[in-house]
């Protein structure tokens, strides 16, 4: 007979405190060490999920060469606009902003999100060259264009994206080229690439201990009293306080989460070819370009998802599998 296992909870304490995210736009706290010149992330909108048939390309798999059913996620990728450039220097207190430059022509809808810089107060590109020696990082300030999608909103999301490159001067030269222009998903990623997805998960509201932490339901006398779905003990008499490790009811969902090493199966420019009959549930038709990612992606439909170059990519042994079929049948349940 083995030792009795203790299981006070199923959820990890590493994610505590489990509270609502402050913003719908996820924070990007780390970047890939990539010397390729270009943006290292791209914001998209989640349309929905479907399934695909892939040709298994793992020679050691019993299904090698055969069609394999795989769930996939479709993300709409409207072009983003580069509104500004910001330079950072590395200090003992972390990265500190040196200066920033905004494009001459800014979208009027951007004023719904932030206060636009007046024309006479805008800095020129010379301000960037003046602090180039101090700069250690170059980032682009981009905003989405949700009005081109089926999402009923005009206010764009603003995301700060790091520009990769072998040197700061090379990154800054690229930043000057794209300032004020629009970029497509094909300018950043390509089919077969391994990426990470960052997004705010689907919110569940205030939930009890059983659903939130997976604790055991108490049967017998407790259940007959109507208290079977509560934490049996929340701690000893002393210390006279409730420890933060106790599984208690509270907010569940609407947290920022990062999923690593997702594969891009397909990029496309015509949304009609991927939209299922009747449109995606709670989303509708894809009107812009799209990207198909293998597996699931966190968050509900219409949620902003940031695709980032992989920071933990392992060796890609098998490469991009052949996509034999992507389902566009109705998701309406008919």
Swiss-Prot record:
Q: Which Pfam families match?
A: Ribosomal_L3 (PF00297)
Is Ribonucleoprotein found in the keyword set? Answer: yes
> What are the start and end residues of every segment in region (Disordered)?
1-20
Identify the keywords attached in UniProt to this record, alphabetized: Ribonucleoprotein, Ribosomal protein, RNA-binding, rRNA-binding
Task: Report the GO terms under cellular component.
Answer: cytosolic large ribosomal subunit
Protein function: One of the primary rRNA binding proteins, it binds directly near the 3'-end of the 23S rRNA, where it nucleates assembly of the 50S subunit.
Similarity section: Belongs to the universal ribosomal protein uL3 family.
This protein is called: Large ribosomal subunit protein uL3
């Amino acid at each position: 007979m083995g030792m009795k296992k203790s299981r006070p909870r199923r959820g990890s304490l590493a994610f505590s405190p489990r509270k609502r995210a402050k913003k719908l736009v996820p924070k990007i706290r780390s970047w890939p060490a990539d010397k390729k010149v270009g943006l290292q992330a791209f914001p998209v909108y989640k349309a929905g999920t479907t399934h695909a048939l892939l040709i298994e390309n793992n020679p050691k798999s019993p299904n090698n060469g055969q069609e394999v059913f795989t769930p996939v996620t479709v993300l709409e990728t409207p072009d983003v606009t580069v509104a500004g450039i910001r330079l950072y220097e590395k200090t003992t207190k972390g990265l500190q902003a040196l200066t920033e430059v905004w494009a001459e022509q800014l979208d009027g809808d951007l004023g719904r999100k932030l206060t636009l810089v007046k024309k006479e107060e805008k800095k020129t590109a010379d301000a960037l060259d003046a602090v180039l020696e101090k700069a250690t990082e170059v980032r682009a300030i981009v905003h989405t264009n949700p009005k081109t999608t089926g999402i009923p909103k005009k206010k764009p999301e603003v995301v700060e994206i790091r520009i990769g490159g072998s040197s700061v001067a090379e990154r800054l030269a690229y930043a000057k080229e794209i300032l004020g222009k629009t970029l497509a998903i094909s300018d950043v990623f390509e089919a077969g690439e391994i990426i990470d997805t960052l997004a705010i998960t689907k919110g569940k509201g205030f939930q009890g201990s059983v659903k939130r932490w997976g604790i055991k339901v108490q049967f017998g006398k407790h259940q007959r009293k109507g208290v079977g779905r509560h934490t049996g003990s929340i701690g000893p008499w002393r210390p006279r306080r409730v420890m933060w490790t106790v599984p208690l009811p509270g907010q569940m969902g609407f947290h920022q989460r990062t999923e690593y090493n997702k594969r891009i199966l397909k990029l496309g420019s015509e949304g009609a070819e991927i939209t299922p009959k009747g449109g995606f549930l709670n989303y509708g038709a894809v009107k812009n370009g799209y990207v198909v990612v293998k597996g699931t992606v966190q968050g509900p439909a219409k949620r902003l998802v940031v695709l980032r170059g992989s920071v933990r990519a392992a060796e890609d042994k098998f490469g991009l599998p052949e996509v034999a079929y992507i389902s566009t049948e109705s998701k309406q349940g008919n």
